[in-house]
Regions:
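Short amphipathic alpha-helix that is part of the acyltransferase structural core
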Residues: 1-18
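Conserved beta-strand-loop-alpha-helix junction that forms the acyl-donor binding cleft
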Residues: 82-92, 109
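Conserved beta-hairpin
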Residues: 24-38
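Conserved GNAT acetyl-CoA-binding A-motif
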Residues: 73-84
Length: 137
């Protein structure tokens, strides 16, 4: 475990998703045996909200706790937003289990057919804290 420079994490993330990440961002790299196993990238910070992107084999409770702590305690946001593709079925199953609520559908967000819609999911601070309480039992 440990932390890495955000640029190193960004480069790893871009290599995994196969496209550049252009916005101003912050990042958390999750390590195992001194190698990045997963990454969380945050961008479009408004003071109240930040957008969230994750790449990894799965999101562990420990990783998720770090993400919640960073977003809601360090940044003092009131919401965390992610916009997965409609076709990312595993993600769409996992997000509600993590306390996220679907807020909107962005037609053709990732392309020109219905499978390329973006689904806006939001985790509010109160729901994140509730999730932490239920998982601490």
């Amino acid at each position: 475990e440990g932390t890495l420079n955000a640029k190193i994490v960004k480069n790893w993330f871009e290599e995994k998703i196969g496209e550049p990440f252009e916005n101003k961002f912050s990042a958390i790299g999750f390590l195992k045996d001194d190698k990045i196993q997963a990454a969380a990238i945050f961008n479009n910070y408004t003071g109240n909200n930040i957008d969230f992107h994750y790449y990894g084999p799965r999101i562990t409770r420990g990783n998720y706790r770090e993400i919640i702590d960073y977003v809601f305690n360090f940044l003092k946001c009131n919401r965390l937003t992610t916009i997965p593709h409609r076709e990312h079925k595993k993600t769409l199953i996992i997000l509600p289990r993590m306390g996220f609520m679907q807020e909107a559908i962005l037609k053709y967000y990732y392309g020109v057919d219905d499978s390329k819609d973006g689904l806006v999911y939001v985790l509010t601070k109160d729901r994140a804290l509730d999730w932490l309480k239920t998982k601490d039992k």
